């Protein structure tokens, strides 16, 4: 394999839970830009608990991709609200205000990509 190529292989059970930057829920960071040398902020397996809320916020330079693996959330983006359940995908462009209200314990894959 060429020296400039990076292969990263992990099982999620080997990755410690850490608090989210919003102070709600917990996540296991699967990969970061530093590790893979690509313009991702992070790829994380995120767990949010029923009743939690990720307050309205904005990422000026980061697009977010959410893939819901279980549970239920209401995600408000600017003036629209989306009910998200298992197997749903949601893209939030950089610069959009968004908030997550957790209806049922939710497991999701979150991918942040710098613009």
Q: Which role fits each region the language model picked out?
A:
Residues 53-55, 90, 94-99:
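Histidine-centered metal-chelating micro-motifs
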Residues 69-70, 85-86, 104:
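A cytosolic small-molecule/anion-sensing beta-strand core signal
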Residues 1-40, 55:
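A short, N-terminal "cap"/entry segment at the start of jelly-roll beta-barrel domains
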Residues 72-74, 81, 97, 107:
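Structural motif
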Residues 79-94:
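Short acidic-glycine-tyrosine-enriched beta hairpin
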Residues 61-73, 78:
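Glycine- and acidic-residue-biased ligand/ion/polar-headgroup-sensing regions
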Residues 31, 44-60:
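Conserved short histidine dyad/triad with adjacent acidic residue
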Residues 94-115:
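Ligand-binding loop in jelly-roll beta-barrel domains
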